[in-house]
Every structure is written in C-alpha cells, then in structure tokens.
Amino acid sequence: MTLTQFNLWIAEIRNDRTRGASELARRSLELLAEAARSLPATDAVELRERLLALAVALSAARPSMTPIQNLLRRWRETLQSSAAPNLAGARCLAAEQAELLMAASWRAVAECAAHTAELLGPGRTVLTHSLSSTVVETCRLLKDAGLRMIITESRPLEEGRQLAERLSAWNVPATYITDAQIGLFVAQADAVLVGADSVLADGAVVNKAGTYPLALAARDQGVPFYVCCERFKWRALDDPPPELEEMAPAELDTPNWPGVTVRNVYFDRTPARLVSAWITETGVHWPDAGP
C-alpha cells in the first residue's frame, strides 16, 4: 500500500455523503483490515505504528460520527495491548480484530432494529429523516406488517431517495416529502423514528440537520420521537461534544450572489428532553430510567 492509496482512503471516508455513521465505521475497519494485510513493514512494531497512524487519521476524517471514533479506538486499544510474535502474526491479529468489530457492529444493528420493530408494532405510520441503517433494517422487519412510511428528501444530497427506493421494492406504502413539509406531515405519523450519528452522554442526539426541527414539531403535535442506534454511537461522559461538520456550499447549487454567504451545516443537535425513547441493542431506554 502506497502513501497515495493511504490518502485516497482518508479522502473516501471524509468525502462520503451517502453512507451513515455505522456504515462508514465498518468501511474504516474494512480498510484497516486491508492495510494490515498489505501495508509494507519490516517488522511487527513498524506495522503496528503505521496501522495506528492510519486509524487515527480515519477517526479524524469525520468528527461528527462517533461510531468511527469508538470502534477504531477499540481496535487501537486491542492492537496496543496485544503482542504478536512476528510480522505475519501481527498482520493476522490486526485484520482479525477489525473483522470481529465489523461483525459486532452488524449484530448491534440487527438487535437494535429488532427492539425498534417490537416497540413500533404492526400497522404503524412512521416518519423518518435522512438515512439510517437501523431504520432501514427496522423497515425490513416490518415490511409485511402493515408499515407505512413518510420520508423526507433530506437535502442537500437527498439520501431519502435511497430509502424510498428500498420501500418501493418491498411494496411498503410511502410518502416522500421535502424537508420543509415536516410540520405538515408529522401529525399523520404514529411515531417519528430517526437514527443518530452520535449520542451524547446526556442523551442529546447529533444527526442530519433537520432532526432538531423535526423533534420540535413532533413534541408540539404529540407524536413520539424515537432514536434507534447502537451503543457504539454513544459518547462517554468525558468526551467533548462532536463537531457539527459543515460541507461545501456548492452542494446547494446556488448562484454566486455578491454579499450572500451560503452555509451547508450537515448535522444538528437535538436535546434529550425532546426524545421519547432511545432504542439500542440492549433494549428500549425511557427518559425516566436515563438514556
């Protein structure tokens, strides 16, 4: 693996606008497994140092996405605490640990979705925003149980289209709306269900911009607002709040207006007081019991 390839991998994670936090975390682990097998090194110590540097760079590429940081931190800790007898053993250990964490992430998504599907039950209309792997899996579990969906387009790149396409293939009735229409449609839903890119220790949720006003609309109209995500997305009490990433204004496809500043902040923060329940792989967590 060359320095050019290394930089291309970092750029891939940094510039990805279509995959969610968990998917990018698993992709980062996949890249680390590939690097473990192919990265030039003279001995196990050099390999470990080069892999650790790559993991740190991948973690820093998407500061709003906690699962990348948490899963890669766990991988780094395993690498630092394990002593491989030789270079071949070090390669095998690093790759296997990355693959084990990828599998753990997939299991957590499946378990989280199972708890969410049980909470929602059959015959429900659910409104969602952006694209979440746990929400997609929940929809798959409920697709033959009378599920109806309301999907926001999720500008600027409209990742809601991907969910709409899947629901259409599953023959799940769905309504596709602009983000600006959430206040009009939230009352038609039995529940709002979103994923998360990060959850703070107090239960506040960092997710695609538009989640906060959706939570406000849901609270105003008496519709429960559920957040389903794996525990890998939760930040420790002493972790600083994640950066709310801002992307290129060009994504909004606006003219060059003199004196006008175009902003494209991708994430917002929804206070814990607006969350009806958090659903993780360990079950449903209600506010009275703490997040």
Protein language model features and the residues they cover:
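Short, glycine-rich nucleotide/cofactor-binding loops
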Residues: 3, 15-21, 37, 125-127, ...
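Non-catalytic, soluble scaffold/interaction modules
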Residues: 53-83, 100-105, 242-256, 274, ...
